[in-house]
Amino acid sequence: MALPVVAIVGQPNVGKSTLFNRIINQRLAIVEDKPGVTRDRNYAQAEWMGHKFDLIDTGGITWEGGKIEEEIRAQAEIAIEEADVIVMLTNVVNHVTDLDERIAHLLYRTKKPVILAVNKADNPEQRNDIYDFYSLGLGDPIPVSSSHGTGIGDLLDEIVSDFPAEKDSQANDVISFSVIGRPNVGKSSIVNKLLGEDRVIVANEEGTTRDAVDTPFTKDGVKFKVVDTAGIRRRGKVYEKTEKYSVLRAVAAIERSDVVLLVLDASTGIREQDKHVAGYAHEAGRGIIIVVNKWDLPKKNSTSAKEFEREIRAEFQYLDYAPILFVSAKTGQRLDQIPSMVKEVYDNQNQRIQSSVLNDLLLEASKLVPTPMIKGKRLRVYYMTQVSTNPPTFVVFVNDPELMHFSYERFLINQLRQNFDFAGTPIKILPRKRK
């Protein structure tokens, strides 16, 4: 299930990034930061009082300047659209500015929960100035100090209280998956076949689909939500402003998905753009299924599928965990397998392994391969525990994290895959020093 999304927005230089860093370092439950795959937006997963959420840091919003400022504002607007809860950060030192008022008006029109936070409010002499911010019409301003941490707990309490109820309820789980790929590989056709109706405009021209459309459906009693996106093009090939915006929305769709279908075109083979698309999904840590479309078109024989699969594995070595499905959106071949595969990958992403079982695995692994030694110092592995799901994330407590060579980390991941079903999902290993 996709996590609630919180976006921090505001004018330039009010302390948004400092607040972002303060929140993601607030609890040890935070696993890792994940840099935004697009410019001027950073993502991280955070947790407060048992509530996990995705946090987005944005660039400063302004309507002045040139193309750079316009791009930053476009990024912020995407974050606002993506968010379930919005934090508008202001600065008590600056008082209420015309730019604050314009941003507040923009947020008010979203009809989403907006929390007004006033930064640099740790000086008692400036507390009275906070009341001026009521004029923005966004409710009670919450005084905070991003640099010193004052008021951050109150802000987080307010944030989690505004989360949509359905996103906190396991009973209402909806498996969200996006269909991504370079233009004209047949993404919309696949979605239409899955839904049984023409919900997305389809044409032979590249970039026919301009927007991301969320569509719920149910299959065998399981609730799904499919997000179909416009094709992702290499940045150098994106000329139109609308097409550039579609690239950004496709990346946002990946962030909102549990599972990603990476669609390849069997008739054209693997292109450089396919690798860029795959990189977006892999870096986001989402479950991935590789879907080879147009399998009805090429001339093939009994070994064609194996040969194409070998090519995929060679070109996408970092996606060795992703299952491959050969389909035809035109004839409907094997498309009926997609929902069950998405459900399987989703279940694999969200499974938890008991620490006792993990430590038995560590013991057996130590008998197979010795731990690495660097500059005369050997890595000692003490125990392992799972700290997160989606993707499955494991903390390994060691004597010195610097001694954890990538090859041994890969060995541990392979051991996990051999002993448990993690098909379709990446696995993260985080070495930590035992205290």
Swiss-Prot record:
GTP 1 binds at residues 10-17, 57-61, 119-122. Keywords: GTP-binding, Nucleotide-binding, Repeat, Ribosome biogenesis. GTP 2 binds at residues 181-188, 228-232, 293-296. GO terms for molecular function: GTP binding; ribosome binding. Residues 4-167, 175-350 form the EngA-type G domain. The keyword Magnesium does not apply. Associates with the 50S ribosomal subunit. Belongs to the TRAFAC class TrmE-Era-EngA-EngB-Septin-like GTPase superfamily. EngA (Der) GTPase family. This is GTPase Der. The gene is der.
